[in-house]
Amino acid sequence: IRDSPDSIHKIIEINAHRFKTGAVISDVCGVKSSVSESICSVLPEGVDYVGGHPMAGKEMDGFVNASSELFWMSGYIITPVKTSKKESVELIREIAKYIGSTRITIASPEEHDSVIAYTSDLMHIAASALCLSYPEKMNRAYTAGSFRDCTRVARINPKLWSELFLANRK
C-alpha cells in the first residue's frame, strides 16, 4: 500500500473483507510506528502485516514521473511488528530484492522512525528552509549544482509531507 499515513487505515478498513487468510499486507509509507499500529488494528484474523520502506524516491510523483530503475541499488527497510511471521518477512525481503534493492535492513517501526527523522525528515525541512530563505533579489545566475542538489527535495507534496512530519514528530 502506498498512500499517505492518514489514508492507509481507511484503505485497509474498507478493503479488509477482500483479504484472504494467509495474505501478507505491506505498506511503503515513510513513517512506521503509527501506520503499523493503525494497520494492525483493522487487519482481519489470519492476515499478516510487515511494514516496508524503500529508500528511494523522487520529488515529483505521479505516473508520468515513474521510473523502472527507481529502486535499483537502493536501500529497503523492513519493519516487522511482533506478530509478523518469519516467512512473511522473507517474502518482503524477496520483493525488495526483486525491485532492485540491495541494502536491506530489518528494524522495528520505532527504530525506523527515530533514524528517518534525521536521515530524511530533517533533510526535507532543511531544504525547504533554504528555499524559503532564498533572497528574492538574488538572481538564479548565482546558483549552480550545489544549490540545486540541496534544494531538490523541497519540491515535495506538501499534504503528504505534513502528514509524515506530524506522524514522526516524537
Regions found by a protein language model. Name each.
Residues 13-64:
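Rossmann-like NAD(P)(H) cofactor-binding subdomain of soluble oxidoreductases
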Residues 64-70, 163:
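Short, flexible, solvent-exposed loop/turn segments with mixed acidic/basic and small polar residues
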